[in-house]
Amino acid sequence: MTELFIDGAWVAGSGPVFASRNPGTDAVAWQGESASAADVDRAVASARRAFAGWSALDFEARCEIVKRFAALLTERKEAIATAIGRETGKPLWEARTEVASMAAKVGISIQAYQERTGEKRQDMADGVAVLRHRPHGVVAVFGPYNFPGHLPNGHIVPALIAGNTVVFKPSELAPGVARATVEVWQEAGLPAGVLNLVQGEKDTGIALANHRQIDGLFFTGSSDTGTLLHKQFGGRPEIVLALEMGGNNPLVIGEVEDIDAAVHHTIQSAFLSAGQRCTCARRIFVPQGAFGDRFLARFADVTSKITADVFDADPQPFMGAVISARAAAKLVDAQARLVEQGAKPIVAMAQRDPRLGFVNAAIVDVTGVANLPDEEHFGPLAQVVRYATFDEAIERANDTAFGLSAGLLADDAKVWEHFRRTIRAGIVNWNRPTNGASSAAPFGGTGRSGNHRPSAYYAADYCAYPMASVESTQLTLPASLSPGLHF
């Protein structure tokens, strides 16, 4: 089983065998040997050797290879979408959009590098001031399972464009997608060692994160793991650390004219990707009174009709399975804990089969829960909070250590102006789902939701560092000398 990609070749790992499973059927989706610490060391060494040549390559030449990667992704869209669906449970319709986003990321990343970094010159006395940007060197990229193609791609593409070399450690729950993606890079003509793939579980990740020869670490994943990485690298200022983590995201519902539109956007916010987007709304703030009652009744009615099915079902479902049977069980347990604390189920969650990742979309009213835990339940579990005043809704929405996304559904522009000025989040949407984001805009949040703005336009900022120079083409003695100097 040659599932590692090191120095331009597919090789076997020397660590334990592990497997990924289709969460909708429990069938094995991928199996292979993990990378040991020695394998990780070889991958980092390969990236280090390749760095000089890759970073010295003309910018346009690097971009041509990356553009070929995008073209090949488009050609292989269906095969890669199938790999994504098989390992994650994501319906094919959604997996196809993920592949399209991967390809689109290339043009955006090239534009971002040129506009946010690149090279700038300004004439000055006796010379010219030049701003250039240099790659960091070898960067480790850690990918998540929820978007196993798109999210690591959002680190890898801008890193390569800037001239870095990469060691990629994907989620152990989606290694097959990583293999398929790296095969496309190989066919695109990426030189040996520029991108290396190390498959594995926790030990592989620890070996890579602790390696003394990496110059940067780009991570998308849970806030708990990202916080540990932040602590680990707190004493290593030489490492550039880019973290994109989770959120306990609020969606505030105003008394709108079109209740069905509000319900639609709430369902998209809370349950798209089976609630496994870091920007999904976890807390739904609904006004007290008759309007709020009507909204909740309609929200519950439409939610109760959502069915989850296998990724390639015909007709396609809105939701697939969550990533694993274990993840499904944790969500049901989270609901039970909330109920024990005083929450009232509106649409109760249940796991269809203990061997599979299928749960139904659920709504629980947590208004009466004292000291509501500030936790991200990564799945289709929406928590409703009833509010008396708009200021109360904003105050409670901001009562979180996270700050990734937030949304407002309201007809009044003045209400929106107040909301956007007072809410604390990196992505703030009006009359759009909380998980609606533009790849041409910054993506990321405040607080425990991360630092930098990985995976989108601002990724160029952390993939290269600025180098300032003052230059003159000719060495000459100044016309005016400093006091005390005699020539």
From Swiss-Prot:
SUPFAM superfamilies associated with the record: ALDH-like (SSF53720)
Gene Ontology terms for molecular function: succinylglutamate-semialdehyde dehydrogenase activity
UniProt cross-references to Pfam families, sorted A to Z: Aldedh
Name the active site residues: E244, C278
Query: According to its UniProt record, which reaction does this protein catalyse?
Result: N-succinyl-L-glutamate 5-semialdehyde + NAD(+) + H2O = N-succinyl-L-glutamate + NADH + 2 H(+)
**Gene3D superfamilies reported in the protein's UniProt record:** Aldehyde Dehydrogenase, Chain A, domain 1, Aldehyde Dehydrogenase, Chain A, domain 2
Top-level EC class: oxidoreductase
Q: Is Oxidoreductase among the key words of this record?
A: yes
Q: What is its EC number?
A: 1.2.1.71
Q: Please indicate which superkingdom the organism of origin belongs to.
A: Bacteria
Whichever gene encodes this chain, its name is: astD
Q: Name one GO biological process term.
A: arginine catabolic process to succinate
* Pathways involved: Amino-acid degradation; L-arginine degradation via AST pathway; L-glutamate and succinate from L-arginine: step 4/5
Sites binding NAD(+) sit at G221, S222, S223, D224, T225, G226
Per the similarity annotation, which family is this? Belongs to the aldehyde dehydrogenase family. AstD subfamily.
Q: Which InterPro entries does the record cross-reference, listed alphabetically?
A: Ald_DH/histidinol_DH, Ald_DH_C, Ald_DH_CS_CYS, Ald_DH_CS_GLU, Ald_DH_N, Aldehyde_DH_dom, SuccinylGlu_semiald_DH_AstD
| Assigned keywords, A-Z | Arginine metabolism, NAD, Oxidoreductase
Give the protein name, as stated in the record.
N-succinylglutamate 5-semialdehyde dehydrogenase
For this protein, the record's HAMAP family field holds: Aldedh_AstD
Upper lineage is: Bacteria, Pseudomonadati, Pseudomonadota, Betaproteobacteria, Burkholderiales
Species name: Burkholderia cenocepacia (strain HI2424)
> What PANTHER family is this protein classified in?
ALDEHYDE DEHYDROGENASE-RELATED
State the protein's purpose.
Catalyzes the NAD-dependent reduction of succinylglutamate semialdehyde into succinylglutamate.
